Amino acid sequence: MSEFALHGHDLFGEVVKPKASGPVAERFTLPPFTILDARSGEWQERKRAWLSMGFRSEVGRLENSLGMSDAASLGEKDTSIFDPVAVELAVRWFSPVGGQVVDPFAGGSVRGIVAGCLGRQYWGCDLRAEQVAANEVQSEDIAPAVRPVWICGDSMETLADAPAADFVFSCPPYGDLERYSDDPRDLSAMDWHAFVAAYKRIILRAVGKMKPDTFACFVVGDFRDGKG
């Protein structure tokens, strides 16, 4: 697969690469520190470049999914969108080109399309048929040469047939912080004890698909119960 040109090509057909801030950044795209600064100019420049491709990851999700949860009391009314730069870094740093990414909590289209653009195979599972259909449409519109695979179903069951993973990469629900559906199988619709039990079982199944000497990455946000 030819090198992906996030910033396009120059007049001579060469891939445009913004000047790196140093040799470490040149090798790793952005400096691989323990704490990543998503507000930095370099990060924001890459994010704008990715988003200019036309991502609409909220399509297929329930409108105002944050408003269905307790987070509404915080004034957070919009559906969250996954940062494509976070996907790019995780995929580049922790998986080989041509490798298989397995995502048991797929949600929107961003992780699948970015992984595909970077030369990885992608398998993701989501409970909602509407979400899977929307992801497939976006993938065809944004990067028709990329072929992420989205499966509609419960990861508790579908992971048995998932491919062996070079990288398990996902963004699970954060308790009841964001509600995705009223499906009783949806972790975001469960009470805390049921959520934790199902969460552990799905992650155990996902980790069981990993090849030797590979990595797993789960992106989570800050979450506290009503008692803080």
Report residues per predicted region.
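Class I S-adenosyl-L-methionine-dependent methyltransferase catalytic core
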Residues: 1-228
